């Protein structure tokens, strides 16, 4: 059972990768900038508010871009039917997942979710089912695990930066996911990748395996590249200073990438902005 579940998770996550590749291919062939807009909106749609939802919400997004790309229909495969046996359900306030209301589990969720719930004293959210016989969908587990959960930190950092510098200058998943976030100014661009790995060693090895440094070093000389360690990883890792472990290893591989914690990122971006202006 376990092996089959893991295989299904991998298959589900590949659905997102296939969508990414289709969007890149279509954009390369057509140059239609609506595809870039579509990809960013679809990726940001996979968030805590849309873990469990009505099919109408999904169809609304599909309809918005149905004349832009045939690949938009693929997101229908990212969700599966869910049977809500109770009219009153509870969702995790961090990731949006349906919580088991077994009193012994105390509505617990992932370690990341519990970190932010404890820090901010967040309580589970009530999710009431209407009596109209409406059906609901939930995100498939592989997409929840490999896209929604890492996206929690990406979206949080994006919203914070956009709140400071404006949504017209701060882009989410720019250039069809070349990076997670970019901050654009007259004389340069700050590119940001947020990496949410349990182990700093696994993070670096994955970057090497995926040849991510080629992408990071391909930016212009007056651009900046930041690799950001989410707050919960930096503060809960027990094997040493997470950021320093990654930083030391990456310095052996490239001098283009700056490794910072989430807290440090905002000062770094602010310093660069002040220099540019």
Predicted regions and their residues:
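Exposed, interaction-prone assembly regions rather than primary DNA-binding/catalytic cores
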Residues: 5, 160, 180-181
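Acidic-basic catalytic patches of nuclease active cores, encompassing PD-(D/E)XK
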Residues: 85, 125-173
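Beta-rich nucleic-acid/ligand-interaction surfaces
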Residues: 73, 172-184
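Non-catalytic C-terminal interaction segments of nucleic acid-processing enzymes
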Residues: 47-51, 63-84, 243-277
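A short, polar/proline- and glycine-enriched secondary-structure boundary/capping micro-motif
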Residues: 119-122, 141, 202-205
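Active-site beta-strand-loop-beta-strand hairpin of nuclease catalytic cores
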Residues: 179-191, 217-218
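Nuclease-adjacent, charged terminal/linker segments that flank catalytic cores
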Residues: 1-129
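Catalytic cores of nucleic-acid endonucleases
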Residues: 195-254
